[in-house]
Amino acid sequence: MPVPELPPPRSSLPEAVTRFGASVLGAVAARAHDSEATVGGPSGGRPLPSPPAGLSFGPPSPAAPPTDVPAPEAPGWGADLERLLCGPHGLGTAGLRLTPGKERPVPATAREGRPIPGLYHHPVPEPDEARVEEVSRRIKAWALDEVSLYPEEWEEQFDGFSVGRYMVGCHPDAPTVDHLMLATRLMVAENAVDDCYCEDHGGSPVGLGERLLLAHTALDPLYTAREYQPGWAASLHADAPRRAYRSAMDYFVRAAGPSQADRLRHDMARLHLGYLAEAAWAQQDQVPEVWEYLAMRQFNNFRPCPTITDTVGGYELPADLHAQAAMQKVIALASNATTIVNDLYSYTKELAAPGRHLNLPVVIAEREGLSDQDAYLKSVEIHNELMHAFESEAAALAAACPVPSVQRFLRGVAAWVDGNHHWHRSNTYRYSLPDFW
């Protein structure tokens, strides 16, 4: 039967409602059900449009093989939700433990690399190899042929990044490789900006604000007088980070709904704001207080990655549900925890690099007078506290708001958190652990 036409846009959570009431949830659930039917439901995903025109910066890439690398078979919703719904910790949360907690077994074929001792995490299966190979092939073709991302001497680092394995592991519910490529292009573009503007490959805190603002216009277009529009348009081709941002965003907006695209723009602005705080400390040769560092890390973190889980999954979390304070808290806790994972796994890499690199163990050691080992182990404890808080808040939200798109979004964020840890643990090209145990 034909899909019913959606009603005109309106808030599904009236202003006067300060908590999730039963009547509101019923209306939101109905609307979310209609929305999922329109975009193809949880398993299908909305079809992706053709690639954007006019983005080629080199010879055409070879013909791609069929895009329908199937998603690995996933367990039912009850199993998927088990991790979140058994997550609460602390007084007063026992009633939210809706299913018995069960740790997934460590896969027998786990890649090399060991987890940080004592770090709270959930082992995950190895990413689907067919998808990893196809995403890896396509992202390299995009980087070289469409955006001229890097010179030949950086190829080993690009390959060592293993971004295909990273994104396949973080988005297990993506219906197609095309959907996975949305996340993969953005991840590569974000790292190009970080490396070329902020860190390894010519980055500097001097003038960073100007570079980031102009690059951000590749995500959030400039609308100005006709006389000056061509100059701005030409600037989007000026360097690899802007070319990558422009192309990745053009692909993304053709697959995402307007509110999903706007969500990403705002999350990227948050990221850039965090870059600027860290740059200011570098210019002043200042080590911030621990709480100041953690505040910066709530902005300079992975947030733009898990919050596109619905677009990559082929569905949409309504904007008013995404904006709820409870959802924002869950997203912030997940993003903060995953970023400390990066601080911990990249610790030895950053110590070996020229200059002083701020990370949580370094800041704690400096500000609290602890040994390097004690500061590192305290950072592990902080990560674990944030992870438990994330799971508790996610479980509470899942129980309070049984809307399909909310449940699936929470599962997607949790999957991203787990996949992010798995990639850091297994990527021994980039990361090794300190000798603290």
Curated annotation (Swiss-Prot):
Keywords: Lyase, Magnesium, Metal-binding
Cofactor: Mg(2+)
Pfam family, one: Terpene_syn_C_2
Keyword Zinc-finger: no
Domain of life per record: Bacteria
GO molecular function: metal ion binding; terpene synthase activity
Catalysed reactions, as listed in the record: (E)-2-methylgeranyl diphosphate + H2O = 2-methylisoborneol + diphosphate
GO biological process assignments: terpene metabolic process
More about this protein: 2-MIB is a volatile organic compound that has an unusually low odor threshold. Together with geosmin, methylisoborneol is responsible for the characteristic smell of moist soil as well as unpleasant taste and odor episodes associated with public water supplies and contamination of various foodstuffs, including fish, wine, and beer.
Task of the protein: Catalyzes the cyclization of 2-methylgeranyl diphosphate (2-MeGPP) to 2-methylisoborneol (2-MIB), which likely involves the intermediacy of 2-methyllinalyl diphosphate.
Name recorded for this polypeptide: 2-methylisoborneol synthase
Species, as recorded: Streptomyces griseus
Upper taxonomic lineage: Bacteria, Bacillati, Actinomycetota, Actinomycetes, Kitasatosporales
